[in-house]
Amino acid sequence: MSANHHFLFITTPKDWYNSRITETTKELIRVKKHILHISLLRIAFFLAGIAAIIIFFHAGTWVLIGAACCTFLPFLILIKLHNRLFARKEWLETQLQINQEELKGLEGDFSDFDEGKEFANPEHPYSFDLDLFGRRSLFQAINRTCTHIGKETIACWMQEHLTEKTLIELRQQAVRDMSERHEFREQFRVMGTVNHGKISDEEEIRRWSESPSDLLQATWVKLALWGVPLINIVLLAGGVTGMCSMSWFGLVFMLFVIISFAIIKRATLVQQAYGEKLKTLNSYAKLITLARQETWKATKLQQLIDRLNIDGHSPAEALMQLSKELDRLDLRNNQLLYVILEGSIFFQLRQVVRIERWKERYGRHLMKWLETVGELDALCSLGTFAYNHPEYTYPSISNKPFQFVATAMGHPLMPAEQCVKNDAIIPSRPFFLIITGANMAGKSTYLRTIGVNYLLACIGCPVCCKQLTLYPAQLITSLRTSDSLTDNESYFFAELKRLKRIIDLLNEGKELFIILDEILKGTNSADKQKGSLDLIRQFMHLQANGIIATHDLLLGTLADQFPEKIRNYCFEADIKDNELSFSYKLREGVAQNMNACFLMKKMGITIQDE
């Protein structure tokens, strides 16, 4: 029964992955049995061939040839069949692993997926604060790419989110379309993984594709490629007809072999520097072929496929042609064949010229093709994320600056049974939410929940909300500032630099969505209060929007100065029967209960009653 037929009865992602695991496991068992049977047949035919040679050794040449053909020919056919079965086995094992990983991901276990920790950057405007990269990060939850360029693309999207309504809606449409193509996403990922489409040296390939093709313009190259085979033909014909001695042919032939050593360096450099890297383009060719077979509904996906077109043909053909030309360079490893080909036609020089001609014709398109495949790969990941969360909703992107209205919003990385959902309303510009509350009451989690959902919305993904409407301004946060020993920079100064950056961007007219946690943490209370109050007043003057969490209840008085522009909310800690509890539900107003002294007493620290 086909996967499509099965899907008619499947209602959840968990059912789908379980179904694929069951089907793949059954087929894998069958393939392994076939491999075993073929192995036994190969042994049988090989032994039969040896026996036939011994038995019919004196029976005549034709009988011996016939016996050998009846045994060794099937043996060779079985080798080819065996190789196909092993390739199928690798495909199925990868497919099984991918579906098992997705099933674990649905349970919140992302340990099998790439953390993207190389992208972590404390200086980034928001990625470090929102835990976008690293263990149990948003990147680890989303990234399912099978190409290095795809992985880089997702990281780039997360670090430089979209801020235009039209572009976000086009991305949303593409993610929706991709999320519905379960088999395509699975095949794309399996194919990329099996074929090791991991080009990690894009810049080297870019340099190669953009470098001048000097050999094509060299006169000596043209003369050598035409002259060497022509001279060989003339001398060989002369030797055969008796017009000259065959020794002349042999002497000149060996001279050509020696000369080839002098010019072989260029071929060796091409092979060593780019050979293995360029050969992986074959896997990109297969991914391109797979993508072009689909009929896409989304405009963005149609545009990407249109980019995978050159003179009415698929670039897959050109990439496979390059792969074949590079494979032929490997003939130099066969010493006997190498000597014959070099002496006859300057084979390696000829191959390098063919590769240079390919580069001259297609080189300017190469990076565009790879980047397009990388974007398709990234969209596959976003589509998988959307499919895995059918309860999420696609946000409505507003033209009204500024707006952020969320209903029942939760953190996408928090287990559903532990996730307490809250609303958020920022209806206009300028406008700030001031969030007060006790320690551990949920303020920081609330800020990250807003930040992560805001980012998901701005990269075209569905969000962990019942409903979300937002205006896509540039996100900037200050939640987790740290000391810098290498820069001799204090905690307080590091935060000041971040705040100055925000003010500078606002003065430049940038539209920002600002999320701050506990402003001016590194200074004394009086300074902190005055500085915080003045900073928020400046935000109001600069028409800014955002959310600020604080322990300082005095900031709640700003709502009296800006009754239409600032709103107070809080997370309360409830103390009952000498026990502390948290509801993690957002409430209107300024927090009334603080828990620091209570917790200190619980830990055995003496607190003097007033």
PLM regions with names:
Residues 1-2, 547:
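A composition/secondary-structure signal for short, hydrophobic, low-basic-content segments
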Residues 2-438, 445-475, 497-498:
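Alpha-helical coupling/stalk and coiled-coil linker elements that connect catalytic or binding modules
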Residues 263, 382, 388-610:
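ATPase nucleotide-binding head domains, primarily ABC-like/P-loop NTPase cores
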